[in-house]
Amino acid sequence: MNQSLLAPYGNAIERVNAALTALREGKGVLVVDDEDRENEGDLIYSAETLTNEQMALLIRECSGIVCLCLTDERITQLELPPMVVDNNSQYGTAFTVSIEAKEGVTTGVSAADRVTTVKAAIADGAKPGDLARPGHVYPLRARPGGVLERRGHTEGTVDLMKLAGLKPFGVLCEVTLPDGTMARLPEIVEFGQQHNMPVLTIEDIVAYRNSQ
């Protein structure tokens, strides 16, 4: 990871603290993973505070595949089976079947509809019957040990929400460039400056958790 690009954001602990402050204020954060892994940056919001405007930004500036990171317990509560029985994707990303809110949506594709789906899935008393399957929001199952178990954006998202004292659920989408290619660290830093969002890495979250 090119730490010089991240230097303006402080050290690892300072970068995580800045992200936690932003999340508590209902703002987005940008998380980059290891260069020898996916080497991509995700725009992440708290599912609890997510707005229609933020979802529209995710759809407009990112890949469009908006994912909802959930804990093991919530996946079980909602009875969401894996998308496939034999997950042989390169990094073992734990997609479940896609979902849609049963009520309050039309086609399910609009920013407002996707927010409605997210809110239905994270509601305190959410039940399996509250969601239709398939849909236009893609849940991801986070490993219980977080980034200390798997250094993925899914685990990083849930860890950040827990550390921020929020519900342990977040939405993410990979930041892309206008030509459809993936944004790397230099572009992620530029995006963060444009949108006043903190930038941090999965490695930062690992360091933060190990320091506690």
Curated annotation (Swiss-Prot):
SUPFAM superfamilies from the UniProt entry: YrdC/RibB
Keywords: Lyase, Magnesium, Manganese, Metal-binding, Riboflavin biosynthesis
Gene3D superfamilies associated with the record: DHBP synthase (3.90.870.10)
Source domain of life: Bacteria
Cofactor(s) it depends on: Mg(2+); Mn(2+)
Catalytic function, reaction form: D-ribulose 5-phosphate = (2S)-2-hydroxy-3-oxobutyl phosphate + formate + H(+)
Essential for catalytic activity, annotated site positions: H136, E174
Any GO BP annotation: riboflavin biosynthetic process
Binding site for Mg(2+) 2: E38, H153
Cofactor: binding details: Binds 2 divalent metal cations per subunit. Magnesium or manganese.
GO molecular function, one term: magnesium ion binding
Record-level GO cellular component terms: cytosol
InterPro entries: DHBP_synth_RibB-like_a/b_dom, DHBP_synthase_RibB
EC number(s) on file: 4.1.99.12
Binding-site residues, D-ribulose 5-phosphate: R37, E38, D42, R150, R151, G152, H153, T154, E174
Residues binding Mg(2+) 1: E38
Cited HAMAP family: RibB (MF_00180)
Biological role stated in the UniProt entry: Catalyzes the conversion of D-ribulose 5-phosphate to formate and 3,4-dihydroxy-2-butanone 4-phosphate.
Family, similarity comment: Belongs to the DHBP synthase family.
Subunit structure: Homodimer.
Name used for this protein in its record: 3,4-dihydroxy-2-butanone 4-phosphate synthase
Protein species of origin: Shewanella piezotolerans (strain WP3 / JCM 13877)
Phylogenetic placement of the source organism: Bacteria, Pseudomonadati, Pseudomonadota, Gammaproteobacteria, Alteromonadales
Gene: ribB
